[in-house]
Amino acid sequence: MDLLNTLFQSAPWGPLRIGLHAVFLLAAAYMLTQVLGLRAVVALKHLPKPRAGFGMAAVLVLLGFGAVLVHQATWQLFGTTRPAFVAFMQLHDRRQFNPAHWIQRGRILDATGTVLAETRAVQTSQGPAAQRYYPFGPDFAHVVGYADPRFGASGIEAAANVQLNGGKPESWQDWGELGRQLLTQTKRPKGNDVTLTLDAALQRLAMERLGERAGAVVVLRPQDGALRVLASTPSFDPNQVDADMFLRADPRARLLNRATAGLYPPGSTFKVVIAADALDRGFSGGIQCPADGWTTSGRYRKIRDHEYYEARRAGRTWRGHGRIGLDTGLAQSSNVFFAQLGVYLGHDAFRATTERFLFNSRITIGEGDSGRQFMRTGRIPRIASSDRYGLAQASIGQGKVLATPAQMALIAAAVANDGIAVRPRLIASEQPAAVGRFMQPGTAQRLRRILRRAVAEGTGRGIETPGLAIAGKTGTAENPFGAPHSWFIGFAPADRPRLAFAVLVEHGGYGSAAAAPIARDLLLLARELGHLP
């Protein structure tokens, strides 16, 4: 046994290893000559063709197996030109420790320099090691993610892994030096910091206001896409990652980032999309909106306005809106108006509009050398041309229409930015980039006036705050599994927007009751922090 160990380990190119490679190469050469000889025999037309049976299959299998062996032995073959490296590797057992514990990963910071993730020195059974620490626990878990030697990494920890570990070595010598530092533990490699666009104070307030309720908050700058808030509840503590998080079913889905991946019916907030399409197409007429509602056929339930149900619960009779135009229809969030408007515009217009607004796609919001972080926009299946009622439902944000809070925030930002949607971004060093034009500048300007009116005297008037000039659209999305979801999207200030937002509260009821107050509180703090004039 000692002799075998000596032959295998004492030198990078021992006699036994040379013999094994020689036998393998001779066997491969013999098999190759047999195959070539067989091809030559087949080429003789006057002789019967030999049958390629088990023998040929065996040769192919052996050749494939040999290729695998060659691949596995490449480090030994290349090692002949790097004897110092081979000798070094033979002297160190890499199984004794995990190199990931030894790297001093860089910090993850918010836009103001507040530390969101850092590496701290700890003592383990194998000696000193580095452990990732997240000062705010669950507040940034879905964005920052986690980095754990046992379970890998997620979020920015995964997307920016190379930068956080010190950057990508530029040469084989750099790789070798990094390996020596890790294995000998003579010097702890230090990573680079990554700065995000988030504001820790705003993010923490969003998480606090959502509380135990499931939901999401997205706040961004319309002009450059810088995300100030990307909050999702319920969350998890990245300081306490364990196997149960991934193995046990969680009815509350704490690992799901509802802001970027949660799909919800957008309800009345989707009327902004239909209104933008109508204005781009030059619509300027009025639509009769009866109090008792409207439907495409007697076979289907009537689509009604929320005032109808409020009056019915109070024992009153509602007179209806009568004939109204788009401005009043959007400010008062009339389902009857937009259901008819969507059917009037038609299936082709609806499909073209949702494609222009980038539904059914993904957008990169954070990109590093080792990965990307995405946001889903939504999911809207094709509506059959014969399904007029399905189109009517979709036009008021119900039916088969689903959207993420991040997508609805992007739509609000496009209205605030004269129709141009700028890619939401998490990493401060990334350059702003437009993802498309959602609507014409004139359409965006008119929508800003209408959405300001919606807060001043329409469905969002409950959060009207002096000095903020909030413009927005409430949404109450029907939910087959319980109480309606509460939405509020918009921007502020209305005349010169600096921040756009979307707030979703699952099972929150009316948008003006649950989601809108959260947006108002965030905007008040944003003004104190200097994000708003």
PLM regions: where:
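Periplasmic/cell-envelope proteins involved in peptidoglycan metabolism and beta-lactam response
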Residues: 1-245, 254, 263, 268, ...
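Beta-lactam-recognizing serine transpeptidase/beta-lactamase-like catalytic domain environment
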Residues: 181, 223-268, 273-507, 511
